């Protein structure tokens, strides 16, 4: 699946067309109040571009939260409609459902150039294809799923996907539109361009920075990246499993991943065969408890971590080592912070690493931050706009980096 050959919104003839855009309006809510409108703002360029090209109307659809295939007012998109209306500066019609005869009539009767937001797609079991009942998975029937998809599809001539955060899910709104033109919006196109360049044609040296607790969770990621990168920094909790297996280091009460430990030698063999440099921390900030106000000290890997203590961040020597590795790279993909940045005492390693990748990005290199915790870090320290690309999809970006095909991307039309 080439990421750079997909049809984009700019390839479409939009005049007088009925346009359906799958957006990601899965915003955080406090009751009915939106606490961050970032995802709505991110969709505006695509919506505005379509409106400038005089469509018959624009239908927007999204999920919000996990209503488990049934109506739940807690997850209504009504507050999003209000916020979108004020951001767009034009009326947004909010409909009480996403399929059914009332939706069909309202959409068809809308004035030319209207913007219509449908209610939460996940109110229907047919969107995800299943729901949980008493802890058991209950599947939607194939007939019901086909009917749901057909009803959504009947609202449109053209389908645009701008929801990268859900691109790794084969949900109805991601893969159910039997239309000749299925294009990526600006947000999705940007994701595909950055990941496509890094994974298909990177400017070298190419560095991957990986954090996270368990090696076992990251095996596929490390294995796939070893085929592509020139060097890897391994930080976070999983560094302790590598240190223990490779150097028999004393790791005290730090995270040790038994299942992952069995795979470490194989991964290192592959790294050696591919000529990939693997960089591990050489000192640690350790704590006598996993808590924000724990007692702390710095130890080198030679000293080891004593029993009763655990490593929660890398130390000053590791920061220097990582900085030197980052300084050599021309393309950097970062997925997972190197320490427990949520606690101030253990945030220095993450902050130092962030400073180095910002330096790299502002000097013209390509730096991609995978979504999830690492994107949270960039946001926390206010540097999102100083990084080449901060991904909007944690799970989706991880699966891309693991070498998996994303159903929502594979489903898009190819450029002619």
From Swiss-Prot:
PROSITE patterns: PGLYCERATE_KINASE. It comes from the Eukaryota. InterPro entries: Phosphoglycerate_kinase, Phosphoglycerate_kinase_CS, Phosphoglycerate_kinase_N, Phosphoglycerate_kinase_sf. It catalyses: (2R)-3-phosphoglycerate + ATP = (2R)-3-phospho-glyceroyl phosphate + ADP. GO terms for biological process: gluconeogenesis; glycolytic process. GO terms for cellular component: cell surface; cytosol; extracellular region; fungal biofilm matrix; mitochondrion. PANTHER family: PHOSPHOGLYCERATE KINASE (PTHR11406:SF0). (2R)-3-phosphoglycerate binds at residues 23-26, 38-39, 62-63, 65-66, 121-122, 168-169. AMP binds at residues 213-214, 218, 237, 311, 342. Belongs to the phosphoglycerate kinase family. It comes from Candida glabrata (strain ATCC 2001 / BCRC 20586 / JCM 3761 / NBRC 0622 / NRRL Y-65 / CBS 138) (Yeast). CDP binds at residues 212, 217, 236, 336, 341. The lineage of its organism: Eukaryota, Fungi, Dikarya, Ascomycota, Saccharomycotina. Keywords: ATP-binding, Cytoplasm, Glycolysis, Kinase, Magnesium, Metal-binding, Mitochondrion, Nucleotide-binding, Transferase. Its main location: cytoplasm. Pathway: Carbohydrate degradation; glycolysis; pyruvate from D-glyceraldehyde 3-phosphate: step 2/5. Coiled coil: none annotated. GO terms for molecular function: ADP binding; ATP binding; metal ion binding; phosphoglycerate kinase activity. Its EC number is 2.7.2.3. The keyword Cell membrane does not apply. This is Phosphoglycerate kinase. Catalyzes one of the two ATP producing reactions in the glycolytic pathway via the reversible conversion of 1,3-diphosphoglycerate to 3-phosphoglycerate. Both L- and D- forms of purine and pyrimidine nucleotides can be used as substrates, but the activity is much lower on pyrimidines. Negatively regulates the biosynthesis of acetyl-CoA from pyruvate in the mitochondrion. CDD domains: Phosphoglycerate_kinase (cd00318). Monomer. Mg(2+) binds at residues 213, 216-217, 373.
């Amino acid at each position: 699946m080439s990421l750079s050959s997909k049809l984009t919104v700019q390839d479409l003839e939009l005049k007088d067309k009925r346009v359906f855009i799958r957006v990601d309006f899965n915003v955080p809510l406090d009751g009915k109040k939106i606490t961050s409108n970032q995802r709505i703002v991110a969709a505006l360029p695509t919506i505005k571009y379509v409106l400038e090209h005089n469509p018959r109307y624009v239908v927007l659809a999204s999920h919000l939260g996990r209503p488990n295939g049934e109506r739940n007012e807690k997850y209504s998109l009504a507050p999003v409609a209000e916020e979108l209306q004020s951001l767009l500066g034009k009326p947004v019609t909010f409909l009480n459902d996403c399929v059914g005869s009332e939706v069909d009539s309202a959409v068809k009767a809308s004035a030319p150039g209207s913007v219509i937001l449908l209610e939460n797609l996940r109110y229907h079991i047919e969107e995800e294809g299943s729901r949980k009942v008493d802890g058991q998975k209950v599947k939607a029937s194939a007939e019901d799923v086909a009917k749901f998809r057909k009803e959504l599809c009947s609202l449109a001539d053209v389908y645009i996907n701008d929801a990268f955060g859900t691109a790794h899910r084969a949900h109805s709104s991601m893969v159910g539109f039997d239309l000749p033109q299925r294009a990526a919006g600006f947000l999705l196109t940007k994701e595909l361009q950055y990941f496509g360049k890094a994974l298909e044609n990177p400017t070298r040296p190419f560095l991957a920075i990986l954090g996270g607790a368990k090696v076992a969770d990251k095996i596929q990621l490390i294995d796939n990246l070893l085929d592509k990168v020139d060097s890897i920094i391994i930080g976070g909790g999983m560094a302790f499993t590598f240190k223990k297996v490779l150097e028999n280091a004393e790791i005290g009460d730090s995270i040790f991943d038994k299942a992952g430990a069995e795979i470490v030698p194989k991964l290192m063999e592959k790294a050696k065969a591919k000529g990939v440099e693997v960089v591990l921390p050489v000192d640690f900030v350790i704590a006598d408890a996993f808590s924000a106000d724990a007692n702390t000290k710095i130890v080198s890997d030679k000293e080891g971590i004593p029993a009763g203590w655990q490593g929660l961040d890398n130390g000053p020597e590791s920061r220097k080592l990582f900085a030197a590795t980052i300084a050599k790279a021309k393309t950097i993909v970062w997925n997972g912070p190197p320490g427990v940045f949520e606690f101030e005492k253990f945030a220095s390693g993450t902050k130092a690493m962030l400073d180095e990748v910002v330096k790299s990005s502002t000097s013209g290199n390509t730096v991609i931050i995978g979504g999830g915790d690492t994107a949270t870090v960039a946001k926390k320290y206010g540097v999102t706009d100083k990084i080449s690309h901060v991904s909007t999809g944690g799970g989706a970006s991880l699966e891309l980096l693991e070498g998996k095909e994303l159903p929502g991307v594979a489903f898009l039309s190819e450029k002619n």
